[in-house]
Amino acid sequence: MGRASLQPVLTGFALTTRVHIVGAGLSGLSCAVHLAESGHRVALYEAAGQAGGRCRSYFDAQLGATIDNGNHLLFSANHAALEYLRMIGAGDSLIGPARARFPFFDLRSGAHWIVEPGAGRIPWWILSKARRIPGTGIGDYLAGLRLAWAGPDARVGDCLNAGDPLWERFWEPLTVAALNTAPREASARLLWRVLRDSFGQGEAACRPLIARDGLASSLVDPALAYLEAQGAEIHFNHRLRGLGFSGDRAARLDFGGPDVDLEPGDMLVVALPPAGAVAALPGLEGPQDTRPIVNAHIKLPRPPLDTALKARLGLDATLPILGLTGGTAQWLFIRGTMVSLTVSA
């Protein structure tokens, strides 16, 4: 969703070029916002009846509440996402702690601890036994440097020892949360990039942030309002079935109804998930292996934790999130009387 990913798209665009963007998930919305800001005319098409893709909110009649379809969390190091929020006027819609801290609870043993990075790039905090995860030593953390020299095909499990205490209590939760892939299958290089850009920059870069009033209120609705104010065309219930070509140029968008003709000079951006892109674009190959994330939302008659227990577990008052080990779910999100559990990979 970042500006960097848009640079190849923006390169070579003539000012006021009309750009057709297929897909109104966050990639498509971000692309549309940046192009509209640059003065281009934007037409946005979405297969569903609402924007946001996998990042949206909806009203659940059984719970009697508006919930998010997933428990999405941003790191403060995600400058591209924060810039996107600023552009659409939602820069103040995220909440998070004043300092980065991640409380964990082990469901098997009842042990609990807090991962609290230091301020600088060098992790001096691992020298303090009181700040290390229970049962771990300095060498367990330094072993993570092996990820920096991992080959292109190396997996996290190739670089780190699954028998080390840090595996279950840090490496596995981090890998699953960041890559939605088990460590034995996840790319070591990709995990190193996550570490380098977050924990490797000090605590100010890895403060967790969530949408205060829901994903739609922060990431989707303000973007649609911004695009409408810029004169963008927004079309819902438009599923791209294929492209019509004139020579080697895309000339028509087939939506199974009235087609949309692309004029000479128009540009096309396909911002679809792999399955949708492969179905619409001839000759395109995409990944077939996917891993869903399951979220369970439970409404309780009263808040589940009292003030004393929150303090004991180290939960932040503004962002009560608890990492879980030793069970099926990896994360517990608490918002008043609403509890959400996340099961990844």
Give the ranges of each region predicted by the language model.
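Glycine-rich active-site loop/strand segments that organize a redox cofactor
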Residues: G52-A77, G137, A143-A148, D197
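Mobile amphipathic helical/loop "lid" adjacent to a hydrophobic cofactor/ligand pocket
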Residues: N78-R196, A205
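Helical element adjacent to the flavin cofactor pocket in flavoenzyme catalytic cores
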Residues: V194-G257
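Glycine-rich FAD pyrophosphate-binding loop
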Residues: A36-A61
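Conserved Rossmann-like nucleotide-cofactor binding loop
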Residues: S27, Q50, A275
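Extreme N-terminal leader/targeting segments of oxidoreductases
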Residues: M1-V19, E37-S38
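N-terminal Rossmann-like FAD-binding beta1-loop-alpha1 element of flavoenzymes
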Residues: T17-L44
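Mid-domain catalytic core of redox enzymes
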Residues: G2, S38, H238-A345
